[in-house]
């Protein structure tokens, strides 16, 4: 039944409807078949584990060990071997420090930095001539160029040799890709995909889909590894479909398209978002909760941006700050439904976490949601007053209204014993890695959505604030913002390397949040206006299994 309300003039926007309808509502659970597959997966996992452990014992095999770890990670099955990989890379780090003696220094550098080991980039100074230019011989090794290119994305501020290496490798690879279009189209396409999105910004499950057929074509591929990747992908896809069915039933119960028709109906895309943050089976409950939070955060965004009146939003903001069902009577009808929906998902998760003795973790998530709503209210106030904030004012609020500080805290809920009260408190202080992730989210969103938002009453975007304050063109601002985004990625890398008091799995959630933005907002707002690329991603991850 639809919720009725009085007629009020509103700054309504008509968003495209969902492209999925009820496609994911029903899940066909084939438990018997899955049990057989799980048994095979367990056997294959033991085979690969033996390969990992045996490679540790022979120093001359350390380059091959890195290549094995790289393949495991790119095939999307590293979650099976977290302890073994950590042990192997710690051994390599302890053995060599910054003085790597093996082949493939770019691979060594990237793999260790990805895992949180701060190895020096000085090794790449050997790639340059005395005049500072890169050696011509590097251009003859396409695989080496690609490895160096991928390694540059693990750089931090002040690593000029890697800044130079990125420019050099990109220039070389663009030419090579163009030259190979007709003679080797497969390699040309692979290079173009790498140039479009480097490994460090690519979601693990999407990379697995891309890499599995390539790995299969390698003459030296490990058959156990390949089979584990394929079977494991499909097994996880089944779990993810089951989760999405649960989230779909919850969304169907809210009936957002009818009860809150002004809002974007993007539940499936929100689940994809959560899947980008963590795909591993042990985070199933956390993923379901996060998908629901992102879905409602999208509705909240549209309520503040595109529908609610200023007075309604003030009342709703107060209700969220009080966080009590007794506040529901003070709200207009349509906001009662939304308010109840928000409270319900936190109550549900509180009950689940209570069984683990961690119900209090929800208090941190609630606090971050309250702050998130306060930032929306500040932007609504600016829009209501026609006030254009300074760039600094705007970003201080917009970092929070991006939703990423809230999501960074929320995504820790349900991750198990690795998450402590100290970790939540750390997240709420907005440490540099979370600030950098917020910057990426806000700047990428504003770059691609500001033109549409100018068509209605809306707070000035960060682009507009910057243009007005510094009297510069939009083109200039976009260059500045893209540079800020790249700097934010460097800050993320630095923090993942220097913060040893926060477990790497928690750091990875923040990194993954930034990766999702790069997928959804790389060239346009692919979340609001769902294009073929995102539809293909969702179908490949959640509809079509990999042929065995």
From Swiss-Prot:
<feature type="binding site">
    <location>
        <position position="301"/>
    </location>
    <ligand>
        <name>Mg(2+) 2</name>
    </ligand>
</feature>
<keyword id="KW-0479">Metal-binding</keyword>
<dbReference type="GO" id="GO:0080016">
    <property type="term" value="F:(-)-E-beta-caryophyllene synthase activity"/>
</dbReference>
<dbReference type="Pfam" id="PF01397">
    <property type="entry name" value="Terpene_synth"/>
</dbReference>
<feature type="binding site">
    <location>
        <position position="301"/>
    </location>
    <ligand>
        <name>Mg(2+) 1</name>
    </ligand>
</feature>
<dbReference type="GO" id="GO:0016102">
    <property type="term" value="P:diterpenoid biosynthetic process"/>
</dbReference>
<feature type="binding site">
    <location>
        <position position="453"/>
    </location>
    <ligand>
        <name>Mg(2+) 3</name>
    </ligand>
</feature>
<dbReference type="InterPro" id="IPR036965">
    <property type="entry name" value="Terpene_synth_N_sf"/>
</dbReference>
<feature type="binding site">
    <location>
        <position position="449"/>
    </location>
    <ligand>
        <name>Mg(2+) 3</name>
    </ligand>
</feature>
<feature type="binding site">
    <location>
        <position position="305"/>
    </location>
    <ligand>
        <name>Mg(2+) 2</name>
    </ligand>
</feature>
<keyword id="KW-0460">Magnesium</keyword>
<feature type="binding site">
    <location>
        <position position="445"/>
    </location>
    <ligand>
        <name>Mg(2+) 3</name>
    </ligand>
</feature>
<comment type="function">
    <text>Sesquiterpene synthase involved in the biosynthesis of beta-caryophyllene, a sesquiterpene with anti-inflammatory and anti-carcinogenic activities. Can use farnesyl diphosphate and (+)-chrysanthemyl diphosphate as substrates, but not geranylgeranyl diphosphate. Produces two irregular monoterpenes, yomogi alcohol and artemisia alcohol from (+)-chrysanthemyl diphosphate. Limited activity with geranyl diphosphate, leading to the production of limonene, terpinolene, beta-pinene, gamma-terpinene, alpha-terpinene and other minor products.</text>
</comment>
<dbReference type="InterPro" id="IPR008949">
    <property type="entry name" value="Isoprenoid_synthase_dom_sf"/>
</dbReference>
<dbReference type="InterPro" id="IPR050148">
    <property type="entry name" value="Terpene_synthase-like"/>
</dbReference>
<dbReference type="InterPro" id="IPR008930">
    <property type="entry name" value="Terpenoid_cyclase/PrenylTrfase"/>
</dbReference>
<keyword id="KW-0456">Lyase</keyword>
<keyword id="KW-0464">Manganese</keyword>
<dbReference type="InterPro" id="IPR034741">
    <property type="entry name" value="Terpene_cyclase-like_1_C"/>
</dbReference>
<comment type="similarity">
    <text>Belongs to the terpene synthase family. Tpsa subfamily.</text>
</comment>
<dbReference type="GO" id="GO:0051762">
    <property type="term" value="P:sesquiterpene biosynthetic process"/>
</dbReference>
<feature type="short sequence motif" description="DDXXD motif">
    <location>
        <begin position="301"/>
        <end position="305"/>
    </location>
</feature>
<dbReference type="GO" id="GO:0000287">
    <property type="term" value="F:magnesium ion binding"/>
</dbReference>
<dbReference type="Pfam" id="PF03936">
    <property type="entry name" value="Terpene_synth_C"/>
</dbReference>
<feature type="binding site">
    <location>
        <position position="305"/>
    </location>
    <ligand>
        <name>Mg(2+) 1</name>
    </ligand>
</feature>
<comment type="subunit">
    <text>Monomer.</text>
</comment>
<dbReference type="InterPro" id="IPR005630">
    <property type="entry name" value="Terpene_synthase_metal-bd"/>
</dbReference>
<protein>
    <recommendedName>
        <fullName>Beta-caryophyllene synthase</fullName>
        <ecNumber>4.2.3.57</ecNumber>
    </recommendedName>
</protein>
<dbReference type="InterPro" id="IPR044814">
    <property type="entry name" value="Terpene_cyclase_plant_C1"/>
</dbReference>
<dbReference type="InterPro" id="IPR001906">
    <property type="entry name" value="Terpene_synth_N"/>
</dbReference>
